Amino acid sequence: AKESLLFHRFFANARTTARAIFSTITGIPDVNLSSTASRNPLVVDQRVVGNEFTGYDKYYLIGGNTAWANIRSILGQNIQGLRILEEDYWKEPRADVWGVTDYDLLKEADKLFASRDPQHPFLAVIQMASYHSPYTVPKTPGFSESEASQEDLSNYGFESQKEYNSMRYTDFAVGEFIRWAKASGYYHNTIFFIFGDHGLNDKVRNMPRGYVNSRLAPWHTPLIIHAAPELGLITPGESMLPASQVDVFPTAAGLAGIAYNNWTLGRDLFDRRYDGSRQVYIGGKGGEPIHLVDGDYCYLDNRAGELRLFRLSDPTGEDLAAQEPERFARLRQMAEDMDATIRYMLFNNRKSAK
């Protein structure tokens, strides 16, 4: 992370892995009311930024398979020419129900990318799953488990030592992947995005009370963007800009120098035109709370009749709705407008609508 750009306020637009994949690929938050949008035949066809990568070979790599939540259909239906590589493709053995481990998956990915024509560009999504129950951590050269104190586990939202070490294992695997990429050569012309499908539970204690009361932890993940220094694309550091999964593909296209049409809600995080109007919408199925993150503020509609406003860095965690009525009214209206727009776009952004 020290050699990358870390976005501290990056969020999943909706919770569960299937909703995260849909939101990232389509650029529209998955707010399908009952089941996930991936299972809804009326919304699986979308116009996506991924198809603007003309001339790129496209891959989706997963240690297990995509035979769940209709994910295979979402991917194949929306990204033209996509090769989906699953557990049967890999030489490494399965470790658990999620297929091969993150370490082995990334090792296989490195071999694949290293074998390609370096003059031909590629776009790849690698879905890792070792940091997921049952938290399988096999013996791996260079990695050793560590025991955290119970206080640290509680402060950072971990439920067990196994969960904590599986996170460390995935982090180790990603570090090894970057090292392999450098040795293989393609590193020097590749942009890496590292982010999560969703966050931990709501039990974190190491954050300001304003953040805790906003109930953002289940959707909060890091975003790390990394590229070789000689490309001159990334200035290592930290950013507090609000960002979310829908922004990933527009940002990748912008950094890659691709001129693209954007029918989604995602925005290029490096496009300065949007710096004064960056908000993150977080929703989900019916009954899920709605959040709107705007700078250091979070509007929260808990769907139970309570509407609140918090400042994320506020150590008191006080509800500021009454103290800042204009800001509260503005963010409330914006959240309601975005929610209505997203629900419309789910059904009205088909490729056939060009």
Predicted regions and their residues:
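Short, solvent-exposed loop/turn segments at the edges of secondary structure
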Residues: 19, 93, 216-220, 287
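Membrane-interface soluble catalytic domains
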Residues: 231-354
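Histidine-centered active-site microenvironments of extracellular/periplasmic hydrolases
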Residues: 182, 187-234
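A short beta-strand-to-alpha-helix junction
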Residues: 40-45, 160, 164-169, 215-219, ...
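Active-site-proximal alpha/beta segments of enzymes that process anionic O-linked groups
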Residues: 1-157
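Beta-strand elements within well-structured catalytic alpha/beta cores of enzymes
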Residues: 1, 24, 122-128, 167-170, ...
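A long, amphipathic alpha-helix that forms part
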Residues: 107-110, 114, 146-190
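Second-shell loop/turn segments in exported
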Residues: 10, 35-40, 95-96, 164, ...
